[in-house]
């Protein structure tokens, strides 16, 4: 079974095509409706650690109900969560991050609209901490801190269903994300996927992340096109899911093909 963390403000609904392709290739999938996301109440305050705990709880539940062995996967922010999970858990067979970065990296700010002030990163975080204490629920839409143009650059046909997706994040959550530190040692084979034309998670950022990871084995796999949202495209989703299933089989996961 594969535990899947959705990306920024998304839930499993937006990844239905990719998750269905994984299922068709024989993988059972446990896709997470994280705290404050998807079918859960959106008004609740939450932190990065709360979202990570959702995945750790899912792992424990799945093992308790005989659903092992398990894999980890996540896209974008979900890729960061998958990396954090793989650094905490000793029982995962492999981790597949579809874009990811260490938030504590000095270059992580390059993902955001605050890149011109990279030299002031510590002061920005200190200011953000004060603001998040005073206004923890202040809603910030994605375009307030990320470039939507970069997110959408290079995307192919995208049948995106916005149901149950968030429209903003509370300021307190964003501070918890930007200030968290994710351990670079993961306890299972690690696969980092990224599109060559991703304008958000650029090649230099991905290469730096990959170099920093310590794992029993690690592989960086470049998707030829599709931009940051590549795995939401039906064509890329089908090919990537088949690749993931083949790798999963090599790590001892039984596949149940649905023809």
Regions found by a protein language model. Name each.
Residues 9-17, 29:
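Serine-hydrolase catalytic-loop signature spanning alpha/beta hydrolases and amidase-signature enzymes
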Residues 186, 192-194, 198:
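Short beta-strand/loop motif that positions the catalytic acidic residue
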Residues 19-41:
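Conserved alpha/beta-hydrolase
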Residues 3-7, 194-195:
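The conserved beta1-alpha1 loop
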Residues 226-236:
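Catalytic histidine-centered segment of alpha/beta-hydrolase-like enzymes
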Residues 199-205:
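Conserved alpha/beta-hydrolase "acid-adjacent" motif
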Residues 77-169:
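Alpha/beta-hydrolase-fold enzymes
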Residues 9-11, 38-66:
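Catalytic nucleophile-loop/oxyanion-hole region of alpha/beta-hydrolase
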């Amino acid at each position: 079974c594969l535990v899947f963390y959705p990306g920024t403000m998304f839930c499993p609904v937006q990844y239905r095509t990719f998750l269905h392709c994984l299922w068709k290739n024989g993988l059972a999938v446990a896709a997470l409706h994280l705290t404050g996301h998807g079918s859960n109440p959106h008004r609740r305050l939450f932190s990065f650690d709360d979202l990570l705990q959702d995945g750790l709880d899912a792992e424990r539940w799945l093992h308790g109900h005989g659903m092992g062995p398990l894999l980890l996967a996540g896209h974008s922010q979900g890729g960061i969560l998958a990396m954090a999970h793989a650094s905490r858990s000793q029982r995962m067979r492999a981790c597949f991050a579809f874009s990811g970065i260490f938030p504590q990296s000095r270059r992580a700010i390059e993902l955001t609209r605050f890149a011109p002030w990279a030299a002031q990163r510590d002061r920005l975080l200190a200011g953000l901490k004060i603001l998040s204490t005073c206004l923890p629920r202040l809603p910030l839409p994605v375009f307030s801190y990320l470039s939507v143009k970069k997110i959408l650059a290079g995307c192919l046909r995208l049948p995106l269903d916005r149901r149950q997706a968030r429209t903003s994040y509370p300021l307190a959550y964003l501070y918890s994300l930007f200030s968290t530190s994710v351990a670079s040692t993961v306890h299972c084979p690690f696969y980092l996927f990224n599109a060559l034309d991703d304008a958000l998670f650029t090649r230099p950022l991905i290469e730096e992340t990959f170099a920093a990871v310590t794992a029993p084995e690690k592989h960086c796999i470049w998707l030829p096109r599709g931009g940051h949202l590549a795995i939401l495209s039906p064509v890329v989703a089908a090919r990537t899911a088949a690749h993931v299933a083949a790798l999963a089989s090599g790590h001892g996961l039984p596949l149940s093909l649905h023809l």
